[in-house]
């Protein structure tokens, strides 16, 4: 393998590890908040279930697509959104404050309220299992 290829591979590996560590840290925090038994099945259901909020049908997949390894697009602004799955976007979930900020904002828009620690853990459990 050539040197640039090896450097790229090492960088991607370190980003994957950072993402996994970020998810593990977030899940530990949700457990500290009383959540337990995270479920990928519940996470997927939360991701794909549409709800009517303020007269509009909304789901996580409205902006992020049903396939979290694919890029999305904001339904109102058209702004591109990087893939949610860490396998497709290794920097995803490495910044805990940023992750919490987006959970707060997106849960309020999608669910009409903030997500519970259990819901966040379920979503992260499902998202962390999605592979390219």
Language-model features and meaning:
Residues 100-132:
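C-terminal capping alpha-helices of c-type cytochrome domains
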Residues 55-67, 123:
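The canonical Cys-X-X-Cys-His
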Residues 1-7:
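Bacterial N-terminal signal peptides that target proteins for export
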Residues 8-16:
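Bacterial N-terminal signal peptides
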Residues 38, 94, 98-102:
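Generic alpha-helical secondary structure signal
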Residues 72-79:
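Short cysteine/histidine-rich zinc-coordinating motifs and their immediately flanking basic loops
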């Amino acid at each position: 393998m050539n040197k640039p290829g090896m450097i790229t591979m090492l960088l991607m590996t370190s980003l994957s590890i950072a993402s996994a560590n970020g998810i593990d840290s977030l899940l530990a925090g949700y457990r500290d908040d009383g959540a337990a038994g995270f479920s990928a099945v519940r996470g997927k259901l939360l991701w794909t279930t549409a709800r009517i909020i303020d007269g509009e049908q909304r789901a996580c997949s409205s902006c992020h697509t049903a396939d979290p390894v694919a890029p999305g697009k904001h339904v109102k602004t058209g702004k591109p959104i990087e893939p949610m799955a860490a396998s497709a976007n290794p920097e995803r979930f490495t910044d805990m404050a940023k992750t919490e900020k987006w959970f707060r904002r997106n849960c309020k828009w999608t669910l009409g309220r903030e997500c519970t620690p259990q819901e966040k853990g379920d979503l992260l459990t499902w998202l962390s299992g999605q592979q390219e």
